[in-house]
Amino acid sequence: TRGRIKNIVAPGDFLPAKPGSGDDAPGLACVNAIYFKSDWASAFTEGETRSHAFHTGPDAAGHAMLMHQRSMLKYAKDEHFQFLEIPYLGEDYCLQALLPVEVLPIQELLSQATPDALSNLSRQAVRQEVDVLLPTFELRTRVGLKGLLGRLGAESVFDSRRAELGRMIHARPDAERVYMGSMWQDAWIRLDEKGTEAAAATTSISFPLGCSAESISMPVSFHADHPFLFFIVHRPSQSLLFAGWITDPEQGAGPGTPSP
């Protein structure tokens, strides 16, 4: 991660959860990392970054530094959202942003922004001239994944009686059973006029058990001056590398979740 994420595993991670309880101590840490850095295909002009009002909620507002550019970009809109795609240099990667038409509380935004909504707008997007205001931001998050994976049906890897991880570590037939005790994801993302730099690492602590269309000439506005979602995507494979949300650029953002 080029030093952006440090101390993802600490000595204390290999101590029993309750010292003196007789519980097993972790015996293995699995680390998965991803790093991304790229300039914009069409850079924002630093001299045009200005302080603007940023509506953090329906009845709340602060200020944020918003970058500006006017470029030919893929854009779409429906009754609920605006969609914008900004390519990085080389155009294999892009930033996608989903901006609600109205200022919404973050939980309502997350409930409305379904995968189908994003997919439909992405397919409908056409290249046209877009006037863009986008905040600069930097975020650093740490998210526990045990509960999330459990809700996705992966409970067994955290169960000392059901986990079957021996083949992954070439365990001996007589070795103690290995299971996941916890899983954490650390992410760091910075977005500015030049481009985006992002890094993430996922750690699991294991325990031994005793196409574009014709462009449209009329410019449209995509002014991200209220909470929105963002995604860093590998375009050829449509793989999602990072995802998160911005509620207050001055205070950071929601989890930047990698999908390496």
Give the role of each language-model region.
Residues 1-103, 123-215:
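Non-catalytic, conformational "gating/processing" segments within enzyme and secreted inhibitor domains
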Residues 11, 105, 109, 117-121, ...:
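Soluble, non-membrane globular domain cores that form compact, hydrophobic packing
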Residues 30, 82-98, 213-259:
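Extended hydrophobic
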Residues 114:
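Catalytic and substrate-binding regions of extracellular carbohydrate-active enzymes
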